[in-house]
Amino acid sequence: MAELPVTEMPGDALCSGRFTISTLLGGDEPPPAACDNSQPSHLTHGSTLYLRTFGYNTIDVVPAYEHYANSALPGEPRKVRPTLADLHSFLKQEGSHLHALAFDGRPGHELTDGLVEDETGANSEKSPGEPVRFGWVKGVMIRCMLNIWGVILYLRLPWITAQAGIVLTWLIILLSVMVTSITGLSISAISTNGKVKSGGTYFLISRSLGPELGGSIGLIFAFANAVGVAMHTVGFAETVRDLLQENGTPIVDPINDIRIIGVVTVTVLLAISLAGMEWESKAQVLFFLVIMVSFANYLVGTLIPASKDKASKGFYSYHGDIFVQNLVPDWRGIDGSFFGMFSIFFPSATGILAGANISGDLKDPAVAIPKGTLMAIFWTTISYLAISATIGSCVVRDASGDVNDTITPGPGLCEGLACGYGWNFTECSQQHSCRYGLINYYQTMSMVSAFAPLITAGIFGATLSSALACLVSAAKVFQCLCEDQLYPLIGFFGKGYGKNKEPVRGYLLAYAIAVAFIIIAELNTIAPIISNFFLCSYALINFSCFHASITNSPGWRPSFRYYSKWAALFGAVISVVIMFLLTWWAALIAIGVVLFLLLYVIYKKPEVNWGSSVQAGSYNLALSYSVGLNEVEDHIKNYRPQCLVLTGPPNFRPALVDFVSTFTQNLSLMICGHVLIAPGKQRVPELRLIASGHTKWLNKRKIKAFYSDVIAEDLRSGVQILMQASGLGRMKPNILVVGFKKNWQSAHPATLEDYIGILHDAFDFNYGVCIMRMREGLNVSEALQTHTAPEALVQEEQTSTIFQSEQGKKTIDIYWLFDDGGLTLLIPYLLHRKKRWGKCKIRVFVGGQINRMDEERKAIISLLSKFRLGFHEVHVLPDINQKPQVEHTKRFEDMIAPFRLNDGFKDEATVAEMRRDYPWKISDEEINKNRIKSLRQVRLNEILLDYSRDAALIILTLPIGRKGKCPSSLYMAWLETLSQDLSPPVLLIRGNQENVLTFYCQ
């Protein structure tokens, strides 16, 4: 119950710019005329609530950011809007407090925090411990550009241009950019659909598609970034090794030099990362400036006339014939193919997620990610196209590097464009021994530039910045994945340190993975490995955007509008296609890993709820199919037993729940009905609390069922509501399942009338009826009218029942005494299909005449064979109408004796009054009219004891008592007599007399 403290105020202070306690309580009293409404009121319980509402007679608050935020800002109390109970219920003053006379599910302090506490700190100064946040330029654009401008730009783009030619190189670049641009648009849409936290790509995919795909791609993406650290570090190490070799100072040998330099370099990068995001960001800005200077240096170098040394290496400045020759491809080596070049180049376009991966460190991710990412894609694309075109116009493919290879007078043979510029590289070209030229020399950009050390510095800046960005991305993404605890044994790496919650342990793990791949020491081997992982990530990002759009969920409202769901789908498909065109076996491995991780999360079912598009899609499918079912006419072949089970709280009836679930699981509808009895609907607010608890209990027990509760004045009216309102369209119950009322002889007669009345109501609503009785009882009357604290339901130990275990090689005995449409046969058939009941033998017992036993048995066997149920053992009971034993008859008479009117010698008026006052009692006339039927129940019990004492389950046709002609106590006596003294569970079934089995094919 929410409490609002009331402070005593003098009369002249009863002024309010918002509301007063007097108007709040009285509802009609206006404020005093002397009030100065320009001053804030003190009648707001000592709070600033008056700042959050307006007008008189209301505690409604105006819209505010705090009401929708999941957490309060640092230094501020949590603020919440008033609940519906606060606004709707009557407020009663008791002493100095106002009590809302309604159930409030929130803790009392939460309301106080929201409505009463002073909003101090709303304009509080920035906390000195607040983490560093970046804008779109420094945080996203520069970071993405640095990650895109990696080792491939300087060391492989000239070589790719020589292999593929300028035209196909542009096609490779534009194809890569098309994929990344579409992905960039998808990332922009997803990142602007709500507040983005840390976790980058993993956070965006997991919150869009759900934990299943999000978790798998998060793990793969973190791993791909860790391998990316190795790729860029190896590129840096190659450059340093070449410099050492040119100066004649190698460390060991070419391969081991790369390994040594790479490990030392990645260790330094680890130290920078551990210093914090602020230092890492400063290092990135420095690298960016170095790269820009190196670009300018390269472009100036292409304009400077070639020196003799550069000419010997194939550089002749801009010439049209060089440009024309380099337009077409000249494939060489094992990687000499379009997709071979594409697989090597594509990782250089994959840095578009570098900004999104530090989403938790951005000031406004929703603005920074779209703007910075798309600008980075644009500028880097221009740079790639420009470098490919310019270097392809200046440098020939083959050159010896020997300054003496000039053309000499004489008849010697000279081939190639270099001949026109006075150089003869024919010998090395024919012998494939040229060490220089566009296709042979990886450091061509350095050679072309005006000042080679600046290109080397650019290579250092590009490789180190990309490696640093990948290291940070890998750790940040993995940290968020660890915090969500979707996978076991990784929570250790999720711990954050310092004001920025730096993932130190994640850095160390990424460092270890990077070192392992640096040992490979071959850039062309590492690059294709991560291409598939990045493409897999892009495919899922695009699919996330498409899926969220196609579900038409009201929650999908990205502020970034320049995206297309069909472009996103195309991006997803083309990413998968490219994966297989690049390296089909690596694509299969990547998809296999994703599927394995996906199935693991599906199996574990983590308790997270992120409002994913998968959930929205599930709703759409369910809605579409449910509406579609309305157009389908009922047919016997499509009949399914859809059960409304009167469990009360399901945890009070585990045996009943388990039994019904056995034949409805994955087949039909099961609803656990619960009637809360309360006059005047006083317990309405409880429903939302207890419903979630009971649903979680069902889920924990792995029962596929719905929980439905209603509040009613009495049990019978509540069940009537359930029977009429439960279900949706064709998905409505057609069978009412109840437990046997074991205490009917001692219970209040009104509850007995309700119980039998419920059965009559079920038949009136055209329901079939099943009554389950177990020897140990089900506590029907208590369970149907009681409930437990919902918060304790999930924690309580799950009660085991006999229906959860194997039933062995016992029998399921079916007493098909009367034809109810076939429901008495269908339910045991469905049970027998389940593994727990599969070893049981089914026996069918029918009534018959002793002189026609064989004929009747053959007739029933023939009928059962037409139903294709697989029931072959049939027994005919010829003595079903024999008189029962005297002592059993006597026991029945003793059972009904307390419920008799004994009206045989009373006048008619007295008898009529007695029947009106005691409708459950049995008159002498009713006993006489139903004597044969009563004796039949006694005799049937004797037969059950003779034939089915050791059965796993007894199923028999439920007798029907005619409404108004059979008192409730007599009917209960029949049910009691039928099922008493039996050890196996007994299920009494009566269909609605409509066929549920057919032997026709249409």
Curated annotation (Swiss-Prot):
It is a multi-pass membrane protein. Residues 1-135, 188-218, 359-369, 476-505, 543-565, 598-1002 are cytoplasmic. This is Solute carrier family 12 member 3. Pfam families: AA_permease (PF00324), AA_permease_N (PF08403), SLC12 (PF03522). It comes from the Eukaryota. It comes from Rattus norvegicus. Gene3D superfamilies: Amino acid/polyamine transporter I. The modification Phosphoserine is found at S41, S47, S71, S89, S124. Disulfide bonds join C414-C419, C428-C434. Residues 242-253, 302-336, 392-451, 521-525 are extracellular. Ubiquitinated; ubiquitination is essential for regulation of endocytosis. Na(+) binds at L146, W149, A462, S465, S466. Belongs to the SLC12A transporter family. Electroneutral sodium and chloride ion cotransporter, which acts as a key mediator of sodium and chloride reabsorption in kidney distal convoluted tubules. Also acts as a receptor for the pro-inflammatory cytokine IL18, thereby contributing to IL18-induced cytokine production, including IFNG, IL6, IL18 and CCL2. May act either independently of IL18R1, or in a complex with IL18R1. The chain crosses the membrane at residues 136-165, 166-187, 219-241, 254-278, 279-301, 337-358, 370-391, 452-475, 506-520, 526-542, 566-585, 586-597. Glycans are attached at N404, N424. Interaction between the cytoplasmic N-terminal and C-terminal domains (NTD and CTD, respectively) is essential for SLC12A3/NCC transporter activity. Phosphorylation by OXSR1/OSR1 and STK39/SPAK may activate SLC12A3/NCC by facilitating this interaction. Changing S71A: Decreased response to intracellular chloride depletion. Abolished response to intracellular chloride depletion. Expressed in kidney, predominantly in the outer cortex in short tubule segments.
